[in-house]
Amino acid sequence: MTHERATTRPAPAALFLGFFLGCVLVAATAAGATCAGTPGVVPSADGTPIAYEVHGGGEPTLILVHGWSCDARYWREQLAHFAARHRVVTIDLAGHGHSGTGREDYSMRSFGEDVRAVADAVGGDRLILVGHSMGGLVIAEAARLLPGRVLGLIGVDSLHDLDFPVTEEHAAEMIAPLEADFPAACRQFAAAMILPDTEADLAEWIQADMAAAPAEVALSAMRGYMAQWITGAGPALFEELPLPVVAVCADLWPVDAEANRRHMRSFEAIVLEGTDHFLMLGAPERFNRALDEAIAMIKP
């Protein structure tokens, strides 16, 4: 485990992979045992039903938000560990998992509204928001909507470099294959972020599961996500938040801590060497220890 691995910038395609896929934490298993939670459904600001589960007890509350074309199941290896000491809330964002569909624009702001709706439903004013990949931007949107209730943000293989330049041309290049053949392109997209030595069944499940996502939801979310970086709205969002940010990242892409600190109140990074984008599934024990460390950095 190392801290603040700031090096040269990656190629645009590689960064997009790092920024993008994602799944915000939590589902239901550890060491083969199921950790049952209390389910709920709450309407988001636009009326879309948002499914969530509450596990365990204890403060601060962890709200775990998945990323692009994923859902709460991607965090099954975290539930038993963290629910022993925290109240853990898992969410399916609109268009994912058990939550409703039909939204015209799956924007990052609308996903932030989903998180706010769940936070209001479960209550509490000592929240730590944890977001994987795309979820890193979603939790920033949510924190803006929850003033005074959020202690800090934790990005999981997310928020590597807020200053990385993203252009409309780069975004179009990323989206075009997904528009042409979503299942095949999505499998390739996921496979590029999985290490070759990953257990075969896990690697296949991730690729098949993400490729089965609704294409209209995935494409809308990707366009919305890219727009935040093209316009600069993503970095600007963090400038509005008086919150500490910690990233727990794989070592597939470098972290530019100094770039992030230009936009964030504070930023620290924990890098797990030899892991990939789905480190919470592929290296759960190491990841859980790192997330414990990140929580300790934030918790007053």
How should each PLM-predicted stretch be described?
Residues T2-I63, R85-H86, D125, A212, ...:
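Alpha/beta-hydrolase fold catalytic core
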Residues T48, V54-H98:
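Conserved HGGG/HGGXW glycine-rich cap/lid loop of the alpha/beta-hydrolase fold
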Residues A212-V271:
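Conserved serine/cysteine hydrolase catalytic core
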Residues D163-E169, A180-F238:
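Conserved alpha/beta-hydrolase catalytic His-Asp/Glu region
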Residues T275-N288:
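Catalytic histidine-centered segment of alpha/beta-hydrolase-like enzymes
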Residues G124-F164:
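Conserved hydrolase catalytic core segment
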Residues A45, A80, T90-M134, V138, ...:
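Active-site loop/oxyanion-hole signature of alpha/beta-hydrolase fold enzymes
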Residues A72-A80, H98-T101, L137, F164, ...:
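Short N-terminal helix/helix-N-cap motif within the alpha/beta-hydrolase-1
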